[in-house]
Amino acid sequence: MTNHTQIAYNMNMLFIETSIFTKRITESVCDEDYHKLQVHLAEHPDAGDLIRGSGGIRKIRCAASGRGKRGGARTLYYWDAPDKIYMIFCYLKNERENITPEQLKTLKKLVEENLK
């Protein structure tokens, strides 16, 4: 994974973002709400629901500007090490309910080839 941003936060947790995640999250969520999500994940990295058949990718809700958590953004991330969380993809609920099987296959391959 060559295109990513590294951000260190509390509890020595390192957040590593894919370039598409960085683009999507900045379009969807204000900095304050994203920071709250990072703090929450640093303290509870297993908070997101495991996506079946994903190779360990988790999905968690994140409040989006003016939408709250329910109607907000969905954040996909991978956590396998005690000090790193890979922020993989983000989308708004009004764009789609879930990722497609094709997208899931691609993200699973990304995890298997680059993050494990």
Question: Which residue stretches match the model-derived regions?
Answer:
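Arg/Lys-rich, positively charged N-terminal/basic patches that mediate binding to nucleic acids
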Residues: 1-32
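Enriched for short, Lys/Arg-rich terminal
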Residues: 78-116
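Short, surface-exposed coil-to-beta transition loops
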Residues: 70-75
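Short Gly/aromatic-enriched secondary-structure transition segments
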Residues: 25, 37-38
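A short, surface-exposed loop/turn module that caps and links secondary-structure elements
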Residues: 39-69
